[in-house]
Amino acid sequence: MLDNFIVNQATKEFSVSEISNKIKELLENNFGYIKIKGEISGFKIASSGHAYFNLKENTAILACTCWRPTLAKIKFPLKDGMEVVISGKLSSYAGNSRYQLAVDNLQPAGLGTMLQILNERKTRLEKEGLFNKRRIPIPFLPTRIGVITSITGAVIKDIIHRIRERFPTHIIIWPVSVQGENSGNEIAAAIEGFNKLEEANKPSVIIVARGGGSIEDLWSFNDEILVRAAYNSKIPIISAVGHEVDYTLIDLAADKRAPTPTAAAEFAVPVRSILNNTLQSYEKVLLNNTKQLINYHEQNIANYDKIHRYLTNYINHRQQLLDETGFNLLDVLPCFIELQETKLKFCSKERINPAKIINYKTLELTHQTAYLSKSANNTLKNFEYKLELNSTLLASLDYHNVLKRGFAIVKGAMGNFLSSKITAADEKIFNIKFSDGEIKVVRN
């Protein structure tokens, strides 16, 4: 068509607007819907909400326009230096004679760009608390298992086979695309759909599964709308995306992460044969414990019966003794009363005469007074004896009495006592005191 236009219109005269419109028509009709990969530069958003930027590769530049409704659908912030893949239609802008790409869809391209977007999204969602929710425990024996995955491929077959092999359970499959532009929205809608089912049809646990792949292949499972759907789910979710080394954001929001889809099936149900063996073991233990408990209580009942018979005999014996004692009391009591009455008669009125009681107490007081007087005299004599003995001892220790026995006191010229040869060595004058006087002695 373009070649025909050049041949047919070679000699025709056009106005500027006519040729501009014709070029626009040719671009739109010949290229249609295309995909282009490049790096964003000169990104800016006008007051109208539309975005304008260039897509460049080395020295080549392509102007791009992203209208406000399309920009609102893009799930990550755009900025210079980001490598992207853009889907849209080529057109021209007559205002400055240039062609441009009208953006219809935009996806990140290149590992660096995708990791940058992933880290920024993870940090933002983590601050919101979407990865710190209270985990819902996986039920031990689910009545129904919901599986969200592609209806084709090995993943769904592996999950069904593993569940049937371990513990056959009713499976509800919600088929979705696990890769592509709208995949994240489909998976999020499936989670919300399971949660909206009536209780009679609602699954006990949901498995979100996909096989392994590159970061681009698994990108749908990093979708923000999917993370929020997993966070808000009232049904516990097991995420099984990729292989053990693959991590996506849904893994952080799910209630349990399985390294593979097969492992997710193993987390969902126990092994029936092992469960049966365990129950049989518990049954044996329970029966054995029950028998032991019955034997124990039967033995206790037998012991209680023996104790009851012993206590009954003991009580009967004591009752018999009590009866005999009662009979004896009935026989003895009249005689005892008669004896006490006789004793009472022998008690003369004079024995309780107040005058006699006073005389008796006076005599008793006299005896006590005499005893106290004698005791006081003895104590006083004892103190006098000790006092005399101590006085004699003190007198014997008086130095005057010692001098009378032939001893003397020797003092120096200054009146200091000289008690040994050493203390007297430097003295020239001595004062010697005897019992009858004192003399002064001078050393030659």
UniProtKB/Swiss-Prot annotation:
Disulfide bonds listed in the record: none
Catalytic activity: Exonucleolytic cleavage in either 5'- to 3'- or 3'- to 5'-direction to yield nucleoside 5'-phosphates
Pfam short name (any one): tRNA_anti_2
UniProt keyword list: Cytoplasm, Exonuclease, Hydrolase, Nuclease
An individual GO BP term: DNA catabolic process
GO molecular function per UniProt: exodeoxyribonuclease VII activity; nucleic acid binding
Cellular component aspect of the GO annotation: cytoplasm; exodeoxyribonuclease VII complex
Compartment annotation: Cytoplasm
Matching InterPro entries: Exonuc_VII_L, Exonuc_VII_lsu_C, OB-fold_nuc-bd_dom
Family per similarity comment: Belongs to the XseA family.
Subunit-level organization: Heterooligomer composed of large and small subunits.
Name of the protein described by the UniProt record: Exodeoxyribonuclease 7 large subunit
Organism: Rickettsia canadensis (strain McKiel)
